[in-house]
Amino acid sequence: MKSLGEFIIEKQAEYPQAKGSLSGILSAVRRAAKIINRDINRAGVVSDLVLGSMGRENVQGETQMKLDVFAHEAMKAAFYSRDDIAGFASEEEEEFTAFDTERGHNAKYIILMDPLDGSSNIDVNVSVGSIFSIYHRVTPIGTPVTLEDFLQPGHKQIAAGYIIYGSSTMLVFTTGNGVNGFTYDPSLGTFLLSHENIKIPKDGAIYSINEGGYLKFPQGIKKYIKYCQEDAPEEHRPYKSRYIGSLVADFHRNMLKGGVYMYPQASNYPNGKLRLSYECNPMAFIAEQAGGVATTGHERILDIQPQALHQRTPFIVGSEHMVNKIKDFIAQYPDN
């Protein structure tokens, strides 16, 4: 079975212009994933150190968990060690970080990341994940990066991926040429290629949404949920409702089995809740590379021009036929 390192070296030939830089960044992600995986696996043993709240909120207004901070620092250290990264932005910090050194000024790439998605699930041993996104900077080489570098539409990503920490730990990523998954073998300390050229089934029978917010959803989403619940055996309905509360875990299951994930706008979240740059863009890039679709319900996610670092958006992603059906319902039942 091919290791992640071997895979990266093999694929490096596809990006001669990168001169190994992209491969090096993915290696940094791999290193950070191992550190985060170790801390998560020890969570129940050293609970006072890694479980629970930091007693403060992050920029999103969410309670910051200890493991959020550990994961953030692990990713930050891994990226700072690279000569080819000019700066990064994290869901956990209000402002982006420019690596204000000569090597940082001369670096070509910037990173956006959600260090630990679903961290509130840690203390009940539910799967969580890390999400990352890589872009070419747009400001001149030799200068510090600016906000402009981080406010790029998702279709300009050159790589994106996630790590899911569950019954096994997997790194799934794309560089714009399909999606591949690597499972961590702790006995070897190595990620091994276990899921090659992943494709999302065109249709599925799983819908994932927090139905506790049903009364606050748009009419089109309400109608689609009822459609999923209808008894129509000839169309393989009712569908299964599966919602973990960790975007990475829900997305990962649906990508492998076929399904759709929804986090629409709601009366209490009129612009949606998920972050465009840290969560939606990387997952949308992965989904499209695997043959899926990602939309707000009205617009392709990867076409949105971000206006702010922590901009939120409605998010619907998954199997092509299911997402298109939701778009039909949204168009048919507009909210006036």
Curated annotation (Swiss-Prot):
Catalytic activity, reaction form: beta-D-fructose 1,6-bisphosphate + H2O = beta-D-fructose 6-phosphate + phosphate
GO molecular function: fructose 1,6-bisphosphate 1-phosphatase activity; magnesium ion binding
Name of the featured protein: Fructose-1,6-bisphosphatase class 1
Annotated signal sequence range: none
Recorded superkingdom: Bacteria
Cofactor binding notes: Binds 2 magnesium ions per subunit.
GO CC aspect terms: cytosol
Cofactors required: Mg(2+)
Residues reported in the UniProt entry to bind Mg(2+) 1: E91, D114, L116
Family annotation (PANTHER family): FRUCTOSE-1,6-BISPHOSPHATASE-RELATED, SEDOHEPTULOSE-1,7-BISPHOSPHATASE, CHLOROPLASTIC
Family the entry assigns: Belongs to the FBPase class 1 family.
CDD domains named in the record: FBPase
EC class name: hydrolase
Subunit structure: Homotetramer.
Gene Ontology biological-process entries: fructose 1,6-bisphosphate metabolic process; fructose 6-phosphate metabolic process; fructose metabolic process; gluconeogenesis; sucrose biosynthetic process
UniProt subcellular location: Cytoplasm
InterPro entries according to UniProt: FBPase_C_dom, FBPase_class-1, FBPase_N, FBPtase
Associated pathway: Carbohydrate biosynthesis; gluconeogenesis
Gene designation: fbp
